[in-house]
């Protein structure tokens, strides 16, 4: 942060898939459950990990890799980690996908000095001109013509983006970006939305910040492909946590 660059706190979760044991198994793997896999679109058995990474000026560090065991919600896990973070000396951002865009988490990170930038579900309710409307419905109305959208470039790709500033359910005065790829303008299936709690940022700045969450996706993929996150055979929860710690160190060697 001495560079004056923002600190990014990046949060996401992943599932370390395992084979469901027989009902007769005497010593099944601890803390393994069925979890909804958004990647596979179905229930997946295994361990779910909540990962927190810190990034600044191109340096990315794995701050926490927490085993989720249903005794505490993922929202509470992230809130507890946020409360441990030192307050950054510069304006900084919490980056997440749509599953972590909640009023509780946004407020907790705000207290710690982090503005939230995250993906947003397209069924979220907005209040344009004080009228309650689903994000997807408003986007469909606006995309009848291009006039309300700006063509922006992010990482060499072009998108039509509409900028909304106002309230959401439980969230006041935020920026919401509606985004379509240039060649899929108006296609409901191509619509993506992003929330930003720092209204001073430009549209390009918001999108440029959001893509900085990509390292956590790379971390998950490399841990599964190279460091046996999907294939370790360890029974005890304590042993699993120890393995994850070694895995996290090995990833940066």
For each feature predicted by the language model, list its residue ranges.
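Active-site-proximal, Lys/Arg-enriched surface segment
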Residues: 1-59, 157-160
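Single, function-defining residue in the core of a domain
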Residues: 5-7, 18, 22-23, 57-253
